[in-house]
Amino acid sequence: MSDDSFPPIRTPRLVLRRAEASDAAALAALMSDAISARLASWPMPWTEERMAARIVEWRPVGLICVVERAADGVLVGWVHALRTPEDAARASMGWWCAEAHQGHGYIREAAAALLPVAFERLGVAVVEAGAQPDNHASFAVMRALGMAPVGARFTYVPARGRHERTLFHEIRRAQPPGRRGLRPGTKAASNDADRKGESPCP
């Protein structure tokens, strides 16, 4: 399931809602060179038209949200969860925060709200995120989500037209798809056996 009819998610300070074409101008205005330098697929410059095209392109394959401050509706950033093209049981999360609103924990709060929704609506078993080795802010978000490191790999970065070393973290769904009758935090009997041999964990 993509983000069609995706209802807003509310947290104590934020509202996450489906990105719309009408958000393109505001999102493009927030994207900066400093933010783009930390992202794999957001090359500068960003125009309203280009942002609208991104929204249309990504909506069918996942959940893409603008992040607004609940108190005043100010747009502070973006968070998404997209199915990976190589594995339908896996999704990749990404996020960015406008420079003027960094340092307040907004992305950590937004990502934590989106993660369980991504598992439920996308029906995936694993959610991952990756970042440059020195992107400590993103790794702090990943740890807060309960993600654990799974190692590094070189990935193609369209924003800079090259392959870069990226460190990945991931988290597995607490229970397999189809076992939603279990109480939250309760594992299926076969869960531990299924995990044997697995390595410990954009």
In which residue ranges do the predicted regions lie?
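Acyl-donor (CoA/ACP) binding surface of acyl/acetyltransferases
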Residues: 1-39, 64-202
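Intrinsic disorder/low-complexity segments enriched in polar/charged and small flexible residues
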Residues: 44, 48, 60, 80, ...
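Conserved GNAT-fold acetyl-CoA-binding loop/helix
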Residues: 35-55
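A short helix-loop-beta-strand connector motif used in the catalytic cores of GNAT acetyltransferases and
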Residues: 55-66
